[in-house]
């Protein structure tokens, strides 16, 4: 979700089981996102609430997807059993390993590789997170303008340093 100036305000993944849509996001954003989504309810019957105490997100075994999954949305009462089941077919890793996988795949995380001025055009997420041909959304004017100009003011890139000591050129 963008702010009115086109800056990325919220980043989340959706999980839809056919009757309920869950948004998974980093800690600390739920309260303000719930307030925003509640204000955006117009004609549809939608209940917005924090289900953090009821569900957990686990990285499931398997090849990484374009969002870093597969992920499993698991009722908290079943987390220990699910972790044991996953552990039978995969090696448990910490969050640093998952972050390394995310960075290697070029998936920025809000407030980690971005700042309060970041726009989707700079982050390489236009094709997967922003639709350029339909709808009306906050920040659309900024995103469309930068897209049409073809040159974002900044661009997030991966820089790989091999550790070599190159030294400075002779003067």
Description of each model-found segment:
Residues 1-171:
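Basic, glycine/lysine-rich polyanion-binding surfaces/domains
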């Amino acid at each position: 979700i963008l702010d009115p100036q086109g800056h990325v305000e919220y980043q989340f993944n959706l999980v839809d089981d056919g009757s309920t849509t869950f948004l998974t996001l980093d800690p600390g954003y739920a309260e303000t996102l719930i307030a925003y989504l509640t204000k955006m309810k117009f004609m549809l019957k939608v209940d917005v609430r924090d289900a953090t105490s009821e569900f957990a997100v686990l990285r499931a075994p398997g090849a990484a997807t374009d969002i870093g999954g597969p992920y499993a949305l698991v009722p908290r009462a079943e987390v220990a059993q699910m972790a044991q089941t996953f552990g039978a077919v995969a090696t448990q890793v910490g969050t640093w390993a998952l972050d390394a996988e995310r960075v290697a795949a070029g998936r920025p995380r809000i407030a980690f590789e971005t700042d309060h001025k970041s726009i989707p055009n700079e982050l390489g997420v236009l094709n997967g997170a922003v639709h350029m041909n339909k709808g009306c959304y906050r920040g659309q004017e900024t995103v469309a303008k930068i897209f049409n100009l073809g040159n974002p003011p900044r661009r997030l890139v991966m820089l790989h340093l091999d550790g070599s000591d190159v030294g400075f050129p002779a003067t």
